[in-house]
Design a protein with these regions (language model features):
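Short secondary-structure boundary segments
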Residues: 212, 240, 262
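Acidic/glycine-rich phosphate/pyrophosphate-binding loops and surrounding catalytic core
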Residues: 1-207, 219-220, 224, 233-238, ...
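Active-site loop ensemble at the mouth of alpha/beta enzyme cores that anchors a bound cofactor
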Residues: 273-279
Length: 279
């Protein structure tokens, strides 16, 4: 970010010191302070600053977030970068808070992020779940994984069952997720995993990701798995183009968690401004 502004080393004080404040122009949930704090410490030597609002706090229009004193050149060089960081991450946190406040089923981010872990951290600040931070956290078997792992000719429920039966315990991580797209695949996943847990006395739950199945079909999958006595071996996650306007239709879906990139990809930045003393 600093390189984008042509800045490649810490900015040395070279003119009169001045004071400025970063203020909110709208209400929201504040996030990204730790990132901006590091930027100021590393790139604005000699600057004195105080955070007047805390990470995760709900702020109102006009709230002062940061009071800073440094040379005018330092502040002018860094103000837009600081505003961009705080604006984007606070926007994600605010959007996530809006979703979470209107829904009872836990909501999770996806890995479709522009700023990677920073975006996921902002989702967490807003009250959402981060899901996996990176691939090594948990084993996730999506369509491409299933296609590349299964034997030639295997497809659908047969492919799901075979791949889950062959999963190596040491590669699992915190949990296992398998992506399914039909009732048959969901049931095959639950049955295969239950058989495996009973045979090997393993205690890892399978997370079945119901991809683009919609609320009604997802509910059918949950009920089918429950009816067959397999619910204790799995959790059920719904995902696929779920928007804020869709939430009402998911209230009775009975899934355990909903994941959507709309938490972070559809979040407008929180509107912030930097005001210099005397303005």
């Amino acid at each position: 970010m600093m390189a984008d502004e042509g800045i490649h080393e810490p900015i040395i004080e070279r003119n009169k010191r001045t004071k400025a404040e970063i203020r909110a122009k709208e209400a929201g949930t504040l996030a990204g302070l730790y990132v901006a704090d590091l930027l100021i410490r590393e790139w604005m030597p000699g600057a004195r600053f105080t955070w007047t609002s805390a990470e995760g706090s709900r702020i109102d229009e006009g709230t002062c977030i940061l009071a800073i004193e440094g040379c005018r050149h330092q502040i002018l060089a860094c103000e837009r970068i600081i505003l961009n960081i705080l604006g984007r991450l606070s926007g994600i946190a605010s959007n996530t808070f809006r979703w979470v406040s209107n829904f009872q089923i836990p909501l999770a981010a996806t890995r479709k992020t522009a700023w990677g872990t920073l975006d996921k951290a902002a989702v967490g600040v807003g009250g959402g779940l981060t899901h996996r931070i990176h691939r090594a956290d948990a084993l996730m078997l999506k369509e491409n994984d299933l296609a590349s792992t299964a034997e030639e000719g295997d497809e659908g429920a047969v492919r799901v069952r075979k791949v889950l039966s062959d999963v190596q315990t040491e590669s699992i991580g915190a949990f296992v997720t398998v992506e399914v797209r039909s009732l048959d695949e969901a049931l095959a996943a639950a049955e295969a995993w239950a058989e495996r847990m009973l045979e090997h006395e393993e205690g890892v739950r399978l997370n079945i990701l119901l991809d683009n199945m919609g609320p009604e079909l997802s509910r059918d999958a949950v009920l089918d798995i429950e009816t067959r006595g397999l619910r204790q071996y799995v959790t059920l996650e719904a995902s696929g183009n779920i928007t804020f306007d869709d939430l009402e239709s998911w209230r009775t879906s009975m899934v355990d968690v909903i994941s959507t990139s709309a938490l972070h990809r559809a979040a407008p930045p929180l509107d912030l401004t930097c005001i210099f003393e005397g303005v």
